[in-house]
């Protein structure tokens, strides 16, 4: 990966995810973790504690009785919603920006990543090999973090890029980013994941979500799941502005998932229902 001094400086200056959020991401990606581990982490962060209790008592979740402790909240919400809540606490910092370079309004990146995560997890249930659905979900949330770093550098280019794709100058939006900047949002997202010291599977899912066929065997099912989740999210209208549906689907997903074309509308319907519930619970 060859990134300019300017972009490396931007990455180094990017505020890190809180230690609390990083610990939650690491723990929930393990096969053998306990509820008490998550409780201890959440209870150390007053903002996250307040958000978890708010979400667990929201109208969208509708608990049968008030949830008054973190232990109750985490038992009731489950890992997926805890990851959502943890990352939503830093959404303003990374996901909730207006992406000027993509002509994408404030908040759209977060909603796209949320829909991608939900769709990717649904897709992962059809994997031909075992795959950790918690890792798939979190990778879906994180896959486009590079956009928040490079967006300002692409300001005013979207019309040129879309025209270039229509005129077959570029095969997709990623190629155009590389032509204009010398790198793309996937490479920058990977660099950010390395800077944050995220586990390798998140790094590769971020780097290869538009080119999953380039993944090593160990990471291929994860990268393809996020790739498909991203495509389904855009098909459902949850994109990030000018690059929406400006990428090809990698047909090699058939090597990793038992999915037919007839499954797609059903996946989108299930994902959209869950997406609306989560969005309401998180107050986005």
Annotate each PLM feature.
Residues 103, 171-174, 254, 276:
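Compositionally biased, intrinsically disordered low-complexity regions enriched in proline and serine
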